[in-house]
């Protein structure tokens, strides 16, 4: 979405992964690198973030597993560098519970810079409205991504299909960006200095 808005975007991936970065690279139009406090260390992580900040207007760091899973976790990385967290929650089978889950993510660790949430796999515009309205007043809504075959990436036994195997990947990414643009109701978090 933000690339379509004309922003230069750099993306990093927490932990070891080779499938997600290929898809993220297509979405961002820039190389995607691993960012991990354990594997690369604090100094290397700081260096690559500093370099990316010099060439991009937005840096996105995709976590691995759940926000608090692993040691160090994506939450540890966010806290260490003061990076605002956007919680992406699979909302396909919930309504008001979405607000409770978002509240739990935001308040589980008091010092986590939590920016807000985005709902994934929503059933309709009305479903997105219900999810947004379930949020406590202090949590920001970043939009909803609908459940749609035009957006979802196919999977197989061991995970996602590789980027080069998807002839329509760019169309899927464009559809996802359009869906987020249609439901987003807030600006980006404040820049990290």
Model-derived segments and spans:
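ATP-dependent carboxylate-amine ligase catalytic core
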Residues: 1-81, 89-112, 125-129
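Internal gly/pro-rich beta-alpha loop/helix module
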Residues: 95-193
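Short hydrophobic alpha-helical runs that function as membrane-insertion/retention elements
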Residues: 85-88, 142-144
